[in-house]
Regions:
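Zinc-dependent deaminase catalytic domain
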Residues: 1-165
């Protein structure tokens, strides 16, 4: 079994999963793996019963609505709903976790975190590292063409760098 090859495949699946998000600013996907099997996946989006609009305009800027549920939360909640445990699992995320998701990841017993792109804040990675969780940047070729930002989205976080969303 080629663990590195499998890890690259899981990250590509997380990247594909991110395409399910309706977010315009940042699409995030994740996959939870335990004993070499995918046990859950998730993407960022609105709670059940809400419309699929993840952003709102505030003072002429497009900002993420506070109700948006992060990919990590959705994947972990799906496990809990079905009576499964994430203890000892690995999570593959398109973007490194925010501090709130990092706290959830650590509390749920996930031992390995792999991320493709560093989120705008490194607080989550720093917390997980201090907490003894293995954190690894895993750069893989996306299984589909990524679209560079053309900065037409009001309030885009790329700051004109043309980063990929």
């Amino acid at each position: 079994m080629d663990i590195q090859k499998d890890n690259r495949m899981y990250m590509q699946i997380a990247l594909l999963t991110s395409k399910r998000s309706y977010a315009r600013r940042l699409k995030v996907g994740c996959v939870i793996v335990k004993n070499h099997s995918i046990i859950s996946f998730g993407w960022n989006g609105m709670p059940t019963g809400y419309d699929n609009c993840c952003e709102m305009e505030v003072d002429g800027r497009l900002v993420t609505r506070p109700e948006v549920q992060h990919a990590e939360l959705n994947a972990i909640a799906k496990l809990a709903e079905n009576g499964y445990s994430s203890k000892g699992a690995a999570i593959f995320i398109t973007h490194s976790p925010c501090i709130h998701c990092a706290l959830l990841i650590q509390k749920c017993g996930i031992t390995d975190v792999y991320y493709h792109t560093l989120y705008r804040s490194s607080e989550g990675v720093e917390f997980l590292t201090r907490a003894g969780v293995n954190v690894t940047h895993l750069d893989v070729e996306p299984p589909f063409p990524m679209q560079p930002c053309d900065c037409r989205i009001e309030g885009c976080d790329c700051g004109g760098t043309g980063s990929v969303h």
